[in-house]
């Protein structure tokens, strides 16, 4: 699917093209997926799983994880952007992060420190939206700006507002 998305708009890609590109039998495809949307959903779920694993490591900086994730997945993010589908990743993050925050130790998370005892669901949505818009701006600019400099700018800003 991703290879096809490099050549064709997502809306124009058919299941038949996916089957031909992957040399899968039609029956095998339909045993695993109902549609091309299911294929894309599977890819998104795998990315979120990888992101979760990276966040779950001890003493990680969530901003570093976010920017490393984006750097590693530049090509995929670019394909989603080209097809006006970046919102799908945002939806997945909005589903995942509130649940994740309830099950993981958030004591080293700078966002958790800002939240304190406040209602987390709205604050998580606020933070995801803020980070998302920064990433969207980076993608929209062609991913030419250094992620390290963007991350450093955000860290300085967080330090200012938490002082």
Residue spans of the language-model regions?
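An amphipathic alpha-helix adjacent to DNA-recognition modules
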Residues: 2, 6, 11-23, 30-60, ...
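Amphipathic alpha-helical interface segments
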Residues: 4, 73, 130-137
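Generic detection of well-ordered alpha-helical segments
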Residues: 41, 45, 49, 64, ...
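Secondary-structure edge/capping motif, primarily at the C-terminal ends of alpha-helices
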Residues: 54-55, 74-80, 108-111, 138-142
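Helical hydrophobic small-molecule/effector-binding pocket
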Residues: 58-106
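Amphipathic alpha-helical packing segments from all-alpha helical-bundle domains
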Residues: 86-133
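C-terminal peripheral helix-coil segments that are non-catalytic and often amphipathic
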Residues: 128, 137-163
């Amino acid at each position: 699917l991703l290879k096809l998305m490099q050549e064709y708009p997502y809306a124009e890609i058919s299941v038949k093209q996916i089957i031909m590109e992957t040399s899968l039998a039609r029956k095998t495809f339909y045993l695993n997926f109902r549609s091309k949307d299911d294929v894309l959903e599977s890819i998104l779920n795998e990315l979120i799983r990888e992101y979760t694993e990276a966040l779950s490591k001890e003493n990680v900086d969530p901003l570093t994880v976010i920017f490393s994730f984006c750097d590693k997945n530049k090509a995929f993010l670019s394909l989603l952007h080209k097809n006006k589908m970046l919102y799908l990743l945002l939806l997945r993050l909005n589903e995942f992060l509130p649940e994740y925050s309830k099950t993981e130790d958030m004591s080293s998370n700078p966002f958790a420190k800002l939240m304190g005892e406040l209602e987390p669901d709205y604050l998580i949505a606020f933070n995801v939206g803020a980070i998302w818009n920064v990433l969207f701006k980076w993608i929209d600019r062609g991913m030419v700006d250094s992620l390290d400099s963007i991350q450093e700018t955000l860290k300085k800003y967080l330090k200012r507002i938490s002082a």
